[in-house]
């Protein structure tokens, strides 16, 4: 009987020791899992900047760049501090900060700015879009005669609403006339006269930055006036004559419209009427 009691005591002791070891092992494993999850936790960085490829139109010749904007409305007069760096094989855009005005009276819109990349040769460039040199986003910038494209591996702190921008062809003009019904005859006369300087034409489907062209339909991106009138007509044409020859026609039409309408025309070289 004494021998049986000893056996039971040894069994109970062994069972307790095994249970203790098993419990310690579970705690260690559980602790490791928690530590591991903490190590791979992803920090959610607020997306304050919107950035997309852009063609900067100029009379001296267009060049590629980026259009950068805040994702939220900012005080009027806010600016974006941008530091671009371009080499033979690399492009770096460092978004430093929003520079606020001394006083904030209105927050009517997002703040926008462009940064130039110069005359890039066709090919692929290693791209970095960074926030204060702390948050680093890597990708590729591809340049061709007709398009500028961006592919990113990460987009921490930024959004890229448009990844491909097509170049605006030489001789292209586009715009909008908004007017009230009593100006119908004037608008018809302007449209007929415009046809003696330019003709309608089509483009490859895509986003051209300043406008979109899809299935023979032109849609202006929001760069024109937002003034509201009862009627609207859009123009998308290729010049048959020098751009300067349009000046008198456009200015005279604007004068006759007065406060009863608004005419806005932009050209391939950045000139806006």
PLM regions and their residue ranges:
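Sec-dependent bacterial lipoprotein signal peptides
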Residues: 1-34
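First exposed extracellular module after export/assembly in secreted or surface-exposed proteins
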Residues: 43-273
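Residue-level signal for the start and early helices of compact helical domains
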Residues: 18-23, 40, 116, 132
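Bacterial Sec-dependent N-terminal signal peptides
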Residues: 24-50
């Amino acid at each position: 009987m004494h021998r049986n009691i000893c056996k039971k005591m040894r069994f109970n002791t062994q069972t307790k020791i095994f249970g203790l070891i098993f419990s310690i092992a579970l705690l260690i494993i559980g602790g490791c899992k928690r530590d591991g999850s903490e190590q791979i936790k992803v920090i959610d960085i607020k997306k304050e900047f919107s950035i997309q490829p852009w063609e900067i139109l100029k009379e001296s010749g267009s060049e590629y760049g980026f259009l950068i904007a805040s994702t939220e409305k900012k005080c009027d007069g806010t600016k974006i501090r941008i530091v671009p760096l371009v080499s033979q094989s690399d492009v770096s855009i460092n978004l430093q900060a929003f520079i606020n005005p001394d006083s904030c009276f209105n927050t009517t819109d997002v703040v926008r700015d462009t940064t130039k990349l110069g005359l890039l040769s066709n090919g692929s460039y290693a791209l970095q879009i960074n926030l204060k040199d702390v948050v680093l986003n890597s990708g590729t910038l591809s340049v061709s005669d007709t398009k500028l494209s961006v592919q990113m591996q990460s987009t921490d702190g930024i959004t890229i609403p448009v990844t491909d921008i097509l170049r605006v062809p030489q001789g292209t003009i586009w715009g909008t006339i908004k007017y009230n019904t009593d100006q119908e005859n004037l608008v018809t006369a302007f449209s007929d006269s415009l046809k003696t300087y330019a003709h309608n034409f089509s483009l490859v489907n895509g986003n051209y930055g300043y406008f979109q062209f899809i299935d023979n339909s032109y849609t202006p991106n929001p760069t024109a006036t937002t003034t509201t009138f009862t009627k609207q007509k859009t123009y998308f044409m290729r010049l048959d004559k020098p751009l300067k020859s349009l000046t008198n026609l456009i200015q005279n039409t604007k004068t006759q419209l007065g406060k009863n309408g608004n005419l806005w025309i932009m050209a391939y070289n950045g000139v806006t009427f």
